[in-house]
Amino acid sequence: MFQGASALTLDAKGRMSVPARYREALQGQAEGRVTVTKHPDGCLLLFPRPEWEVFRAKIAALPMDAHWWRRIFLGNAMDVDLDSAGRILVSPELRMAAGLEKEVMLLGMGSHFELWDSQTYNAKEQAAMAQGMPDALKNFTF
């Protein structure tokens, strides 16, 4: 289970150091293998490989009218491995798609992660908070 936010930096080659608190879980759950793909909100999704296989099966089963979504998720997916220093390489294509340059935010989302450009994430978070609680959360107790 992945949760929490980590402010990270991409190096000049596009490598990101995975926080130590997630490395052991990724090694145990997925032998350090992850899959990275686009998300329609403008970030990237990072899945441990077993979780990716579950997600991939759901996407592949979508009806024909969702063929563009299959292209977005599956056609842009890249398999990567944690290196000996606990880093993953984010491809230039995926960095460009998500507007990632240097400062990024890694969010644990339960079974997977989202990777955002820090400025984009902060702006979207502020906009969401300014809109107030959605109806789905009106009766939710904190």
Curated annotation (Swiss-Prot):
Q: Does the keyword DNA-binding apply?
A: yes
Q: Does the keyword Iron apply?
A: no
Q: Name one GO molecular function term.
A: transcription cis-regulatory region binding
Its chief place of residence is cytoplasm
Tell me a GO biological process for this protein: negative regulation of DNA-templated transcription initiation
The family database entries (NCBIfam families) matched by this protein are listed as: division/cell wall cluster transcriptional repressor MraZ
The protein in question is named Transcriptional regulator MraZ
Q: Which organism is it from?
A: Burkholderia cenocepacia (strain ATCC BAA-245 / DSM 16553 / LMG 16656 / NCTC 13227 / J2315 / CF5610) (Burkholderia cepacia (strain J2315))
Gene it is expressed from: mraZ
